[in-house]
Amino acid sequence: MALTKAEMAERLFDEVGLNKREAKEFVDAFFDVLRDALEQGRQVKLSGFGNFDLRRKNQRPGRNPKTGEEIPISARTVVTFRPGQKLKERVEAYAGSGQ
């Protein structure tokens, strides 16, 4: 089950005490700042959570799965995420609990 932006705003409403409009604006603003930083080519480091980086992928050969024809896959920039140690530990503890 995925966590949505609407659910994040609802949790802020429930746990922090922001009203629903403020909570939605807060979540939207957070992702706007994250997106803007990445668009500017900047790394985003969230202490205790992880890092978002941009990585350049060179052009490479690919294959059309329907025809088998070889086609080039264009060079591009992709966003990568590396979880921080605290996040890794919490996920591993949760996964180890059998839930």
From Swiss-Prot:
InterPro entries: Hist_DNA-bd, Histone-like_DNA-bd_CS, IHF-like_DNA-bd_dom_sf, IHF_alpha. Gene3D superfamilies: IHF-like DNA-binding proteins. It holds the Pfam family Bac_DNA_binding. GO terms for biological process: DNA recombination; positive regulation of metabolic process; regulation of DNA-templated transcription; regulation of translation. The keyword Transcription regulation applies. The keyword DNA-binding applies. CDD domains: IHF_A. GO terms for cellular component: cytosol. HAMAP family: IHF_alpha (MF_00380). Belongs to the bacterial histone-like protein family. PANTHER family: DNA-BINDING PROTEIN HU (PTHR33175), INTEGRATION HOST FACTOR SUBUNIT ALPHA (PTHR33175:SF2). This protein is one of the two subunits of integration host factor, a specific DNA-binding protein that functions in genetic recombination as well as in transcriptional and translational control. This is Integration host factor subunit alpha. It comes from Xanthomonas campestris pv. campestris (strain ATCC 33913 / DSM 3586 / NCPPB 528 / LMG 568 / P 25).
